[in-house]
């Protein structure tokens, strides 16, 4: 399996599979949440933004908050600043908080933000070197509150993700899916403890592929998925193979490339083959990517896809914020299909 797919929970694209999820913005058990970059005309008045949603989750927590994130970065006076205040308030009233961060995300994080998180009462902070588990990273962005509500999306625990990056996420109250997100957190939490104790990482019990009925979660890498959680590397191509009329995809970048040793980019065609096969049988493919998807390594693959019949590709550039240049921001970061 390519390293690029060894990511803990693959992001919103392919994460939640529901036979009911079509054009509606809300279905029972799920609320679509949208980060609208400030100083743009991309507003969606019928969707809430993640700052208020996360604050509401933390304010409503009674017993526990579990957070799995790639990295953490705050900024004074930002929406994230206020969100962390709500997390601090939860810890002060006795809510048990577990925060799990990817080891490779430490260098991307703000040191002051990590110090602030570690200082929260009743918060246990752990760092997981996921490369020692599967060779990849935790790229997940999720939280679970009281084992009854969850949030999963493209938003990093980063102030820019709440104000200056185009993002999507789901607030989840569906009991089955919440329990599956919780199970993934527990698996990774135990993995961190095992590595800290120089013990083998326990593998989840082997299980057959879950039935594709109702609402269900998929994640990767498959070998570390708890029972009942499907394999995103199988599900995404399968969804594309079942498409009859149209597929719309929005994401940061698109290229049939993985991440190998010594900064190599091995060819990885699983998803790309499925996209091309769908276009070949007449399915309309509409792909929207960010302007970060134009480097000399990735652009040729994008061009080779764009020349195919039934394929439309748009490269999107977001305007600079009125306050000036903000590094690692002003970009499409959604992962939706």
Predicted regions and their residues:
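Bacterial N-terminal signal peptides that target proteins for export
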Residues: 1-10
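Hydrophobic helical h-region of N-terminal Sec-dependent signal peptides
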Residues: 12-14
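N-terminal signal peptide c-region/cleavage motif recognized by signal peptidases
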Residues: 18-20
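Charged, low-complexity intrinsically disordered terminal segments
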Residues: 23-337
């Amino acid at each position: 399996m390519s390293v690029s797919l060894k990511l803990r929970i693959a992001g919103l694209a392919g994460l939640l599979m529901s036979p009911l999820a079509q054009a509606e913005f809300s279905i029972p058990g799920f609320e679509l949440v949208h980060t609208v970059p400030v100083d743009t005309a991309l507003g969606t008045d019928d969707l809430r933004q993640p700052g208020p949603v996360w604050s509401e989750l933390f304010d409503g927590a009674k017993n526990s908050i579990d957070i799995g994130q790639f990295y953490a970065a705050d900024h004074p006076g930002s929406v994230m600043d206020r969100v962390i205040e709500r997390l601090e308030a939860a810890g002060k009233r006795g809510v048990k908080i577990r925060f799990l961060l990817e080891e490779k995300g430490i260098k991307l994080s703000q040191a002051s933000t990590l110090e602030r998180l570690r200082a929260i009462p009743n918060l246990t902070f752990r760092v997981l070197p996921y490369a020692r588990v599967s060779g990849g990273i935790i790229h997940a962005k999720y939280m679970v509150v009281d084992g009854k509500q969850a949030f999963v999306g493209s938003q990093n625990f980063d102030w820019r993700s709440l104000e200056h990056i185009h993002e999507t996420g789901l607030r989840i109250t569906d009991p089955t899916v919440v329990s599956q997100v919780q199970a993934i957190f527990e698996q990774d939490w135990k993995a961190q403890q095992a590595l800290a104790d120089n013990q083998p990482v326990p593998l989840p019990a082997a299980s057959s592929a879950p039935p594709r009925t109702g609402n269900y979660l998929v994640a990767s890498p498959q070998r570390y998925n708890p029972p009942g959680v499907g394999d995103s590397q199988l599900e995404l191509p399968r969804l594309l193979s079942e498409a009859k009329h149209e597929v719309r995809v929005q994401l940061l970048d698109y290229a049939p490339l993985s991440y190998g040793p010594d900064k190599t980019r091995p060819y990885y065609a699983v998803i790309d083959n499925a996209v091309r096969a769908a276009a070949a049988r007449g399915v309309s493919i509409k792909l929207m990517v960010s302007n970060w998807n134009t480097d000399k390594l990735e652009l040729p693959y994008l061009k080779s896809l764009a020349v195919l019949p039934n394929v439309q590709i748009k490269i999107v550039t977001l305007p600079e914020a009125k306050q000036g240049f903000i590094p690692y921001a002003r970009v499409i970061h959604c992962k939706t299909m």
